[in-house]
Amino acid sequence: MTLAQHQYIERKSGEVRAERPFGDWIVNYLYCQKREQPPLVYQLLGSQWFSSLLGWVNYDFPFGSSLTGIQRFLKNCAINLSECFEPPEKLDTARKVFERRIRYWQCRPMSSDPFEVVCPADSRLLLGSLARTSALFLKGKFFAYEELLGPDKFLWLDAFRHGDFVICRLTAEKYHYNHTPVAGFIRDFYENDGHYHSCNPGPVMAMATPYSKNKRVVTVIDTDVPNGSGVGLVAMIEIVALMVGDIVQCYSTKEYDDPAPILPEMFVERGCPKSLFRPGSSTTLLLFQKDRVQFSPDLIRNLYRTDVESRYSEGLGRPLIETDVQVRSTIGARKSTKEGYGDD
């Protein structure tokens, strides 16, 4: 099986880079051949048991690194250990590297503009819209809208209908803490059960609406409040994936001190650590209400570049190009105060 190249644009340098997804060949083989797989095999691929087993072998099993190539992966993934909160010598296991903390207050600067939306994670980012009249409209390939939020969540389904969204895909080498993209009060916090399927580009294109099939945690933030970001309601959806068996809520207002669970009606500041994905690749999705946010122009331009190869193409009409973005960097702003913000 020949795999198409998957490229992305690094935001800081503007360079086009090629991604080498961890376990690329075997993961794509299993998912791209899913129509030929017995139903039991496909169910096993997305089960919590299988995901936890793979995570244990890769990150906890004493000989897992040598058996699955993790040591080679760690050597080649270009992790900047100088950013780490802990001394590098303490990061002596694959799990510790994956769950590392960084000095984000120094190495991930954030705009002082309170009405700007910041990226929730070190990730590769896609933009989209649920409104058919929008230039960013994407038909339901990545998720089924009602399934994503929950069919019984009528208030939120009505609030975000025809809105915009951001998909932030965390690859295995990334810093795996999620940070709050906006400031405001938590209006709802709940979990939707589901599978643990891979969120790599190949499997995502091979499956139907994968992000609404996987287990996910939904946090709804009201930003139209005093000291809020003023961009309406924002849904932050943290989605598990293959080898990600857990999402730990650990909100901190100062560095990583005194981590607290997320609770309804608590106020969250923008850019603070909110949660940690346990090992594997994973995805965070942001939903915005219609006409409340204007995305950064460089992210819009990158999305449809024709000189970059992407696996995000099947059933989409045209390839979609990811931009590699750092956590806490600006990805959009309140429309009312940033007229023309997203114009070329």
Where are the regions a protein language model picked out?
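Contiguous, well-folded functional domains in the mature portion of proteins
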Residues: M1-D344
